């Protein structure tokens, strides 16, 4: 089966489609019993085979020219356990006494879901450079006797999705059979985790059950799913960074991508998808009071204006406050107001010209953004402010004052702020956190509009391939964690050219409120995006510029970003009804997801 929750155009039919989801959600498991879908036996067998002190680990690498499978068993091994709520956390440390390499695997075994996760850290505790560590695979496992393969009653299928490329086909589902002696290899096109080719979530399924896998890495990754072994009933899964070949300096430490596996059993693969969606809601989504944080209905408070205005370059304090008051005057009450790119100094001509100077343009906002955010706060509304901190444009403040923090490519005006540099990371964390506090920001919106992979490659020596990427990505996670810790209640909006950095780690810390840069407000494309992304992720947002019912309903995805111009031709009554309807239905979008029709991108399908 495939799904179009929002494919119908008429009100009653639409509500009927939503009610299908509503009834499932409201009874939590109407239609299927969770206990019959949880493959705890499969999960427990996996734990016994891989996640203990004495078992071969679920990861692999080559160390000093030798496969880890042949040497790690000779190292010193220790382990410890602790419990955190519904999680058993087991830490296993593998130490090479001859070189001082310490490999630490942190395994998380969930009690409330048939799921496991792990992440691996490498540290050189010796006094000399380590031997070369290469071809690191954070996941390198086989599933012998995979459910359904013995009976040959149906093929082994790989259900995955495209990433984002500002196209109607963004997040489109890809269903591929895995034939015996074959394998499927996939990953993003470059240095952002869900760029164009692949989303780092996938379901390996048969007619009896399967495993949903997720990769937590916000850079370059690669996964391979195959049946190339001698036993066609065995499924092989490897995943990790796209390229690694590095030595570690004395005292240096790096981490791998994180991996999650969820084991399910059913003759309907949607049971696996829905169980994974629930797992994400429970353990990998921002929480408020122990429940998934309600996503906001947003509205912009500035429009581009006549040439040469673009984005929010020409936005002003008076205009923004006037827009907030105008929305309130006409009964449109968003949860949060929104200022996008262009509010900062040096944003002359084009919005990107000031990226790297993160101070407010005092010509347009003489008192900073606080008067604007305060106007929203008086109405009970939060406030979204856009940043793109990893990109630094030539001539901006960071480019002038801290060139030592930047990586520059010849002939390219964009520089990369190195989040693996402790000084750069500390400055950025303090500066943005203080800005959030002082200016009254409640939703921090982070964009990332260029490919970092060439910069990381330029930073790496031949014997340090992957180091720049690993340190930058870990710096990103430290940055976001610090913002959340210092600003209780803060929500992070993960943009990255619209949905190009969605993975398990970013999903755990943020929400993509603007999931694609596909042509703004086009409803049929938005239907396609909802269709594909919701197989794995229950919460995302997109834009709406037209209050007509089909247009607005096509943008429903947990959050919505409105850009309505309240002029004489604007249908105010429809807009008020849209907001009220969305509020009444929003919770049900977190329910189970059941495809009603086949996936199609043509206009005639919608």
State where each predicted segment sits.
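Active-site and adjacent substrate-binding regions of carbohydrate-active enzymes
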Residues: 120-122, 374-376, 423-504
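Bacterial N-terminal signal peptides
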Residues: 12-24
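Glycine-rich, aromatic-flanked loop segments that form ligand/cofactor-binding clefts
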Residues: 50-75, 200-219, 266-300, 330-341, ...
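Short Pro-Gly-centered flexible turn/kink motifs
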Residues: 246-265
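Active-site-proximal substrate-binding groove within the catalytic cores of carbohydrate-active enzymes
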Residues: 32, 476-606
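Bacterial N-terminal signal peptides that target proteins for export
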Residues: 2-15
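Aromatic-lined carbohydrate-binding/catalytic grooves of carbohydrate-active enzymes
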Residues: 294-433, 439-443, 452-455
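Polysaccharide-binding surfaces and accessory modules of carbohydrate-active proteins
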Residues: 31-228, 232, 242-244
